[in-house]
Amino acid sequence: MPLTENQIEVAAESLFQAEISRKRIGLLSVQFPEIDMEDAYKIQAALVEKKINSGLKLEGWKIGLTSKAMQDALKIDIPDSGILFDNMFFKSGDEIPTERFIQTRIEAEIAFCMKGSLAGEVTREEVIQATDYA
């Protein structure tokens, strides 16, 4: 059974406040054992709205859980996607303010800066054509 709109709002607000206060919260999958991918993306959408309303700017998207090992660990069978905001980027040489994070970690990411849009099923060639640089 899908989460209710109230449960989605509670989950999104919990995540939003955890980021602001830099305090851990429990796993949403424990709080809401019936949660599924569709619910997770609804929570993400509600969280994105909160962040945009707080003044953050959407800068891009990311694909996560691309390795089979991580998918197996989380009991999912497809990669997920996430939103990148302007406060998530640091330039070479920047000092990263560790106090901003609950648990400071650095993860290298490969970024594709796009010059065109992609939608639906696309070919490798279409991705290359839409990519400005990586």
What is the predicted role of each segment?
Residues 2-134:
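Active-site microenvironments in enzyme catalytic cores
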